């Protein structure tokens, strides 16, 4: 059931190929994302889902395989440990080694020339074949600009722009893309960069946004831009739009607002405030609409109830409210956006090993 290469998978891989990276702990949310793809799939297209993993249990593989009942949708599982060898990938904060697996996609899928990579913390609210059909000839990938990061560049965190330019070597930091949704030209990537080069870059240092930084460093703005509706970043803590993206240039803000009107993919990106823990999170209703049809519904509901009823869950909620509803707004008042003292404080905080704001 667990293959070491796409060649060993019992999938035709003849049309739309979708790749996830997932651990056992995240399987319930992968199930919801998978359900959203199934419910929006066109009858005249073929969809093959490949899950890159190192620890998904046989029981979970069986459950996910049974979930995919449609005749034109298939699912298979690839073992990443064989490709990693003795390399230990760095991780910090809410990021985990699984986030690096997309770097290995060109090697793990030698018989696939084009594939969509998706994070597991999202739902697809349109036919994903439309994204797959985007022409990436001559480019390594297609992606959306990262409205959150661009908003930080423009004032919310002015250490970000110099980091992207000086550490990543980006010609224009405003070209930074969000890597949770990618249309990857695997043939192009295989011809231009080796897996060893990707992994060497990823382990050189602790990159601020991990393999997303590595991809942006390698691509350096040379990618096909797709509309942000294909990777709508949910309004995290109901602060992302008003406190961060509001600092971005007008065209970025406008595209983000257009995406919010009718998102094709809703990405629940952020260290907290996920809909399976916070029912008042942005777009939580959309998540639960698909979760209702997941075989993991009871487990997801249980996690929500635990976060609302247990001492540990309530303590975590209180901590989150204090930080994001109290401390962060107060920080913005004491150290206004765009000021030198704000930049100095953030630089010191990051230098001490602090997580991204």
Residue ranges and their predicted role:
Residues 169-181:
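A recurrent flexible, glycine/aromatic-enriched loop bordering the glycosyltransferase active site
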Residues 77-83, 99-155, 183-184, 190:
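GT-A fold catalytic core of metal-dependent nucleotide-sugar glycosyltransferases
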Residues 86-91, 100, 151-170:
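Surface-exposed acidic, glycine/proline-enriched linker/cap segments
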Residues 60-108:
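Active-site-proximal specificity loops/subdomain of glycosyltransferases
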Residues 47-55, 143-145:
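Short internal beta-strands
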Residues 16, 41-50, 75:
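Short loop->beta transition adjacent to catalytic acidic/histidine clusters or analogous donor-positioning motifs
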């Amino acid at each position: 059931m667990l293959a070491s290469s796409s060649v060993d998978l019992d999938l035709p891989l003849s049309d739309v190929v979708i790749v996830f990276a997932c651990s056992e702990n995240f399987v319930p949310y992968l199930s919801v994302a998978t359900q959203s793809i199934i419910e929006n799939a066109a009858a005249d297209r073929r969809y093959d889902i490949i899950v890159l993993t190192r620890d998904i249990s046989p029981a979970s593989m069986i459950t996910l395989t049974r979930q995919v009942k449609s005749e034109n949708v298939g699912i298979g599982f690839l073992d990443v440990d064989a490709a990693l060898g003795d390399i230990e990938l760095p991780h910090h904060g809410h990021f985990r080694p699984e986030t690096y697996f997309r770097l290995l996609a060109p090697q793990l899928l030698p018989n696939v020339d084009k594939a969509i990579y998706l994070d597991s913390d999202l739902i697809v609210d349109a036919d994903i074949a439309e994204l797959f059909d985007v022409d990436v000839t001559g480019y390594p990938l297609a992606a959306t600009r990262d409205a959150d990061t661009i908003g930080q560049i423009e004032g919310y965190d002015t250490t970000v722009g110099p980091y992207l330019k000086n550490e990543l070597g980006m010609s224009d930091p405003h070209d930074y893309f969000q890597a949770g949704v990618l249309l990857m030209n695997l043939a192009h990537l295989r011809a231009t960069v080796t897996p060893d080069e990707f992994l060497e870059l990823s382990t050189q240092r602790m990159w601020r946004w991990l393999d997303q930084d590595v991809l942006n460093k390698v691509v350096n703005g040379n990618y096909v831009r797709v509309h942000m509706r294909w990777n709508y970043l949910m309004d995290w803590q109901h602060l992302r739009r008003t406190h961060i993206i509001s600092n971005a240039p007008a065209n970025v803000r406008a595209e983000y607002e257009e995406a919010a009107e009718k998102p094709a993919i809703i990405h629940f990106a952020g260290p907290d405030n996920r809909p399976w823990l916070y029912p008042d999170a942005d777009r939580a209703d959309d998540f639960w609409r698909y979760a209702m049809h997941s075989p993991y519904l009871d487990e997801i509901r249980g996690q929500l109830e635990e976060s609302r009823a247990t001492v540990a869950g309530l303590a975590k909620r209180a901590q989150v409210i204090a930080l994001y509803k109290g401390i962060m707004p107060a920080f913005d008042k004491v150290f206004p956006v765009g000021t030198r003292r704000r930049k100095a404080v953030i630089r010191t905080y990051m230098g001490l090993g602090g997580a991204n704001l």
